């Protein structure tokens, strides 16, 4: 008994050491931003995004607290074979109070198995909810190739001349399909699952320090037996992507060309939309004239072109630069599309290895296909920043900023009660829209941003 008791502390110590080693193996990654801001005309910080654009220039122009908390662990390894479990929970609040409750978004929960298929060395099979090979422009927080969601696939199959990846994911629309419920009337509504099938070929050597990635995405509405889509709904579509990445000046330049059809045009990033329905509504003009806007599904029949160039480079020891230029044209058969182009730069001057000054200048211009009118906005931000390193990507960062924006909006989306419809009208038409008119504003504040 004495021997057993004497061995007990050693056993406890060994067990504690094993559990500690296991606990230390957990990977903790994430992203967060938060701050406080004011508006020159009074009140809390306003943020500026031109009506019709899908994103905005983000420096000194983010009005929410947002966080992604990722926990993952390699749960099994034998030789070069392994299983990795990954999760991600995201939060977003308006940063107005100390206590702001919100429902978290469970954005990732997946398992990735590496080198499990003997005859496909280096490949990874996976299943679950996942951020899947996302492509974005950081300075405008714009994701131009992103099929994230619940799914499964195999990636990084070595073909010798490039890496092949295959995946299937899903995104669901509310109220998109209908079935007979009573008296032979389609009045029972069910959400519609939109499936996306993705094929990518990456790592194609094109020139010194240059690689090409090609991709094809097919998305379609997958209705349940006994249900049907609303007449005229966009049922499917394609998206084709070619992206050339050039390593240069201690950074990179990416040139992207994308073409999409029908259901793949709304979001323009690889997820299908078009099975959802919308109700008719009536708009009354100041003179009493009433205009009826008929029931119209999210009919996305048409096409989208996007040409994009963006990058981040170093210009000597003291300067860094982010930049973006993009043209996007969504041409729909129902005449509700838009033409959007944007250009912006964010130079960084490094006073010390941990202190810098940033200047972001961005311009957006959006034309309504329905009205022919244009909205435009200039946005300028000057920020003084302290960051963990001398790269334009160094984080965490704490910055103080001042932002000025001037806009002139000639059109807006027509209001349907508390909602915004997909119909557009000129600002001077007398119809109630979400157009901001012709004005300007400035804001100032402080913000932290971190990824790890």
From Swiss-Prot:
Induction field: By maltose.
Membrane topology per record: Multi-pass membrane protein
Site (Important in sugar transport): 143
Compartmental location: Cell outer membrane
Domain of life: Bacteria
Keywords recorded for this protein, A-Z: Cell outer membrane, Ion transport, Membrane, Porin, Signal, Sugar transport, Transmembrane, Transmembrane beta strand, Transport
GO biological process: monoatomic ion transport
Function statement: Involved in the transport of maltose and maltodextrins.
Protein name per Swiss-Prot or TrEMBL: Maltoporin
Organism whose genome encodes this protein: Salmonella paratyphi A (strain AKU_12601)
Organism lineage string: Bacteria, Pseudomonadati, Pseudomonadota, Gammaproteobacteria, Enterobacterales
Gene that encodes the chain: lamB
């Amino acid at each position: 008994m004495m021997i057993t008791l004497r061995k007990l502390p050693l056993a406890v110590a060994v067990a504690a050491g094993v559990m500690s080693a296991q606990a230390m193996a957990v990977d903790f990654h994430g992203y967060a931003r938060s701050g406080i801001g004011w508006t020159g005309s009074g009140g809390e910080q306003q943020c500026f995004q031109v009506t019709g654009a899908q994103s905005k220039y983000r420096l000194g122009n983010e009005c929410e607290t947002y966080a992604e908390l990722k926990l993952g662990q390699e749960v099994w390894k034998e030789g070069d074979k392994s299983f990795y479990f990954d999760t991600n929970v995201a939060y977003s609040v308006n940063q107005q109070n100390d206590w702001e409750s919100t429902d978290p978004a469970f954005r990732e929960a997946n398992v990735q198995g590496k080198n499990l298929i003997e005859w496909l060395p280096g490949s990874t099979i996976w299943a679950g909810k996942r951020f899947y090979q996302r492509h974005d422009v950081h300075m405008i927080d714009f994701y131009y190739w992103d099929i994230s969601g619940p799914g499964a696939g195999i990636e990084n199959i070595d073909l010798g001349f490039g890496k092949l990846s295959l995946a299937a994911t899903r995104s669901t629309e509310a109220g998109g399909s209908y079935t007979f419920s009573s008296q032979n009337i389609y009045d029972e509504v069910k959400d519609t699952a939109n499936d996306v099938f993705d094929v990518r070929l990456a790592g194609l050597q094109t020139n010194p320090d240059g690689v090409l990635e090609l991709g094809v995405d097919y998305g379609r509405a997958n209705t349940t037996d006994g249900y049907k889509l609303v007449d005229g709904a966009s049922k499917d579509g394609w998206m084709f992507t070619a992206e050339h990445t050039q390593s240069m000046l201690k950074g990179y330049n990416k040139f992207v060309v994308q073409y999409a059809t029908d259901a793949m045009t709304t979001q323009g990033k690889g997820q299908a939309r078009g099975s959802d329905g919308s109700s008719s509504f009536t708009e009354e003009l100041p003179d009493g004239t009433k205009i009826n806007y008929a029931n119209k599904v999210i009919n996305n029949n048409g096409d989208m072109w996007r040409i994009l160039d963006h990058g981040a480079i170093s210009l000597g020891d003291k300067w860094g630069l982010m930049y973006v230029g993009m043209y996007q044209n969504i041409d729909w058969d129902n005449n509700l599309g838009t033409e959007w182009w944007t250009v912006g730069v964010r130079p960084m001057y490094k006073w010390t290895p941990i202190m810098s000054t940033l200047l972001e200048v961005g311009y957006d211009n959006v034309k309504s296909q329905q009205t022919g009118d244009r909205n435009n906005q200039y946005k300028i931000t000057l920020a003084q920043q302290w960051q963990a390193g001398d790269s334009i990507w160094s984080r965490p960062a704490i910055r103080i900023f001042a932002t000025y924006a001037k806009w002139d909006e000639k059109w807006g989306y027509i209001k349907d009660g508390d909602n915004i419809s997909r119909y557009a009208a000129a600002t001077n038409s007398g119809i109630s829209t979400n157009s901001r008119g012709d004005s300007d504003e400035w804001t100032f504040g402080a913000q932290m941003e971190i990824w790890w």
